[in-house]
């Protein structure tokens, strides 16, 4: 793995923040009413891909913590981020003088728990989105890689897909049978409801398969996995056997 330089990291972080300035912060979510004030515990928000984690973090950055540090680890330019890179991020965060840090998918980086534990002890308040798998493991006090226990520094929140009420609010539709049928037909993924395009569903499927299954799971035979996934999707509700 080629280690990123401090200057390159600083440039990437700066560009990420500038890109956010041109993106809508998204629709209000019900979970916002129950998100606690930041304390000496790191706030982790987890959920399935496509549930709106990044958009929620953007809303928090835009509405609640506009002066906070921000880094998006779900960025190809930060692929392979590890403990050595966290040392550079540590310096940049310290030089910025910021006391609050918001991270998107920090769990994609190796050594993130140790970094966050250190920053929390230094008084930095942290919010980050994580995968649902990471959230569930931490809820059982297990490390995401299964290597042992984790420090007791986390406050966990789960973000679900759009509820029926969120769907009504987003689409500005009155409650009723027609709205229920449309909700069941269009689904509850915020991004898909927003665009209404089939291509968005295909993109989400590809990301789940490639990023969450192939890459994260270390699966080498991508083609077979794609065929299996397609078979399961097209035969939902039907009995499936290992040799079928």
List the predicted regions and their residue ranges.
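Structural recognition of the conserved hydrophobic beta-strand(s) that form the central parallel beta-sheet
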Residues: 102-103, 125-131
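N-terminal pre-Walker A segment at the start of P-loop NTPase domains
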Residues: 2-34
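Conserved P-loop NTPase "ATPase switch" module shared by AAA+ and STAND
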Residues: 93-112
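Short regulatory helix/loop adjacent to the ATP-binding pocket of P-loop NTPases
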Residues: 134-154
């Amino acid at each position: 793995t080629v280690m990123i330089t401090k200057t390159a990291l600083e440039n990437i972080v700066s560009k990420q923040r500038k890109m956010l300035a041109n993106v809508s912060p998204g629709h209000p979510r019900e979970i916002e009413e129950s998100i606690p004030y930041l304390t000496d515990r790191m706030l982790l928000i987890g959920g399935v891909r496509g549930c709106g984690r990044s958009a929620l973090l953007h809303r928090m950055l835009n509405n609640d913590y506009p002066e906070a540090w921000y880094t998006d680890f779900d960025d190809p330019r930060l692929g392979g981020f590890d403990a050595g890179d966290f040392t550079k991020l540590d310096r940049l965060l310290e030089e910025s003088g910021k006391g609050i840090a918001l991270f998107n998918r920090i769990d994609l980086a190796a050594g993130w728990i140790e970094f966050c534990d250190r920053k929390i002890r230094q008084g930095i308040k942290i919010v980050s989105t994580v995968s649902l798998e990471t959230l569930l493991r931490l809820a059982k006090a297990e490390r995401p890689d299964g290597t042992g226990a984790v420090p007791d520094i986390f406050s966990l929140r789960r973000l679900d897909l759009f509820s029926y009420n969120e769907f009504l609010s987003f689409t500005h539709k009155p409650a009723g049978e027609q709205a229920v049928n449309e909700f069941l037909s269009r689904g509850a993924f915020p991004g898909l409801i927003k665009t209404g395009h089939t291509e968005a569903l295909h993109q989400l499927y590809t990301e789940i398969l490639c990023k969450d299954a192939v890459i994260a799971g270390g699966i080498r035979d991508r083609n077979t996995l794609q065929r299996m996934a397609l078979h399961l999707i097209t035969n939902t509700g039907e009995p499936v056997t290992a040799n079928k």
